[in-house]
């Protein structure tokens, strides 16, 4: 069973940077050693946003984007190696999620697409890469997402305490770690995605730092109710979603009924949408004693305060409180999934994704010996 240093690379739906984590992993423990966040050039970020909202590309443009993202991920890995004075030979493998540009796990031909050419990463780092983690689960009838509940269970499950782990990235997803029950998990809906899209269009800022804009506004209750009527929120698990559904176009369709509103009020309403949809799912899933929050949304004081208010019987903390940085959780999970793939161990949980069976995930892109 392979053990040693692994690197996890995550570029999520929030597009706030490439998260890279270095960890030692074996069958007994996962120990984070270092991490960094690598910026995504504005032009590349916009190209990804465009394709996620259905803008048509030529095959040449799509191929260029795939290559550019692969090179970006490699640059991020090499920066971490340089910072830690490590060589390629010191790393067992890289687990790279890739950049999701489309996720459609239902219908006649279910599919999900993560790009960022793994061959570019191998060629530019000299390290074996494990990637393309989601499509095997979809081939077995699953949603292909979320995959992190298996990691949350391995690290954070408790024998007697009802726990849930909430990742608030672009999309928010919930892991249900309930003693005596199969692990559960699904996407609750938008996390930071709509808030980020709104402030980017209205104020040219990548995100609402410390929720300053949202806290300056007031929740527009009719708009909130209008958005909450979306059928996704009442859809039973297993379910997953992404930017191809909850995007700026989705927000515009709801705002058509509310002309002339204060942009800060919209920001406040979007924050409340995220908090309400999460808290409703926590309660519908039977509630928990402790909700551990990670992802960019864990740094949003308004979201954290609203979750605590909406879940009065629950201790709401960040995963930092149990020794895992909320900023690095997902990248760390994909380092762990790479370890499981190389060890020949399954990485999905059918109780979460709805797949017909457990399976080894991903494709291996070996480095030259």
From Swiss-Prot:
Coiled-coil spans in chain: none
The family this protein is said to belong to: Belongs to the anhydro-N-acetylmuramic acid kinase family.
Lineage: superkingdom: Bacteria
EC assignment: 2.7.1.170
Functional description taken from the UniProt entry: Catalyzes the specific phosphorylation of 1,6-anhydro-N-acetylmuramic acid (anhMurNAc) with the simultaneous cleavage of the 1,6-anhydro ring, generating MurNAc-6-P. Is required for the utilization of anhMurNAc either imported from the medium or derived from its own cell wall murein, and thus plays a role in cell wall recycling.
Keyword Ion transport: no
Reaction equation(s) it catalyzes: 1,6-anhydro-N-acetyl-beta-muramate + ATP + H2O = N-acetyl-D-muramate 6-phosphate + ADP + H(+)
Protein name, entry field: Anhydro-N-acetylmuramic acid kinase
Binding residues for ATP: 12-19
Example GO molecular function: kinase activity
The keyword Transferase belongs to this UniProt entry's keyword annotation: yes
One BP term from GO: peptidoglycan turnover
Matches recorded under InterPro entries: Anhydro_N_Ac-Mur_kinase (IPR005338), ATPase_NBD (IPR043129)
């Amino acid at each position: 069973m392979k053990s040693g240093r692994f690197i996890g690379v995550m570029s999520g739906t929030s597009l706030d940077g490439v998260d890279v984590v270095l960890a030692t992993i074996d069958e007994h423990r996962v120990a984070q050693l270092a991490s960094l966040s690598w910026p995504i050039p504005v032009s590349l970020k916009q190209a990804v946003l465009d394709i996620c909202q259905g803008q048509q590309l030529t095959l040449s443009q799509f191929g260029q984007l795939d290559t550019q993202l692969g090179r970006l991920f490699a640059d991020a890995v090499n920066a971490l190696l340089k910072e830690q004075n490590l060589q390629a030979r010191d790393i067992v493998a890289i687990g790279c999620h890739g950049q999701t540009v489309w996720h459609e796990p239902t219908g006649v031909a279910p599919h999900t697409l993560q790009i960022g050419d793994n061959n570019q990463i191998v060629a530019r780092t000299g390290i074996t890469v494990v990637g393309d983690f989601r499509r095997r689960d979809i081939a077995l009838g699953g949603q292909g997402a979320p995959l992190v509940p298996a990691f949350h269970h391995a690290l954070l499950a408790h024998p007697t305490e009802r726990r849930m782990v909430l990742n608030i990235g672009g999309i928010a997803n919930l892991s249900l770690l309930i003693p005596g029950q199969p692990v559960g998990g699904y996407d609750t809906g938008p996390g930071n995605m709509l808030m980020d899209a709104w402030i980017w269009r209205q104020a040219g800022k990548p995100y609402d730092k410390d929720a300053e804009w949202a806290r300056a506004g007031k929740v527009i209750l009719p708009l909130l109710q209008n958005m909450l009527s979306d059928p996704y929120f009442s859809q039973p698990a297993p379910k997953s979603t992404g930017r191809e559904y909850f995007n700026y176009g989705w927000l515009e369709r709801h705002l058509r009924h509310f002309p002339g509103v204060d942009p800060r009020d919209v920001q406040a309403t979007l924050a409340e949408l995220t908090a309400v949809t999460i808290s409703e799912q926590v309660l519908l899933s039977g509630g928990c004693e402790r909700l551990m929050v990670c992802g960019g949304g864990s740094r949003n004081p308004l979201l954290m305060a609203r979750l605590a208010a909406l879940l009065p019987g629950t201790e709401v903390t960040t995963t930092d409180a149990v020794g895992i940085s909320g900023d690095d959780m997902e990248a760390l999970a994909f380092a762990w999934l790479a370890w499981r793939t190389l060890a020949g161990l399954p990485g999905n949980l059918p109780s979460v994704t709805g797949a017909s069976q457990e399976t080894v995930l991903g494709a291996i892109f070996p480095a030259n010996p």
